[in-house]
From Swiss-Prot:
Any one GO molecular-function label of the UniProt entry: heme binding
GO biological process, one term: cytochrome complex assembly
Protein name: Cytochrome c-type biogenesis protein CcmE
InterPro entries named among the record's database cross-references: CcmE, CcmE-like_sf, NA-bd_OB-fold
Compartment list: Cell inner membrane
UniProt-listed SUPFAM superfamilies: Heme chaperone CcmE
Family label: Belongs to the CcmE/CycJ family.
A cellular component annotation (GO) from this entry: plasma membrane
NCBIfam families membership: PRK13254.1-1
Role noted for this protein: Heme chaperone required for the biogenesis of c-type cytochromes. Transiently binds heme delivered by CcmC and transfers the heme to apo-cytochromes in a process facilitated by CcmF and CcmH.
Pfam family, one: CcmE
Amino acid sequence: MKRKYRRLFVVIITLSIFAGSVVLVLGKLKNNVSFFYTPTELLSSSLINRPNIRIGGMVVKGTVQKYDDSIVFHITDLKNYIKVVYKGILPPLFSEGSWIVAKGKMVNGKFIASEILAKHDENYMPNKYKTNDL
């Protein structure tokens, strides 16, 4: 019987270590998932007061205003829109009508972005291939 209990003890310890490892890995992955909210979700929730929110949407045409120290534009999810203020260099794919993800926080009804990521669709093609008929 002694050998049976020792084997059971080893199996329980091994399963416990494995379960603990899975919990740690999933906990670390949770922090790296790039989830974003739409303007409608952000405006209709208590997330407005949280720092480091990611918001995604389309840049509204005709709203991009460039100043000496910042860029101001609106993003929409085709239901609501939010004014975004960004200080920094915009990604090359940023343009009116393009989809972006902005990371930042809400301050006085404006979204102050610390980072802008431009999205492209799955049909992206480099400029050198766009002019050639393939």
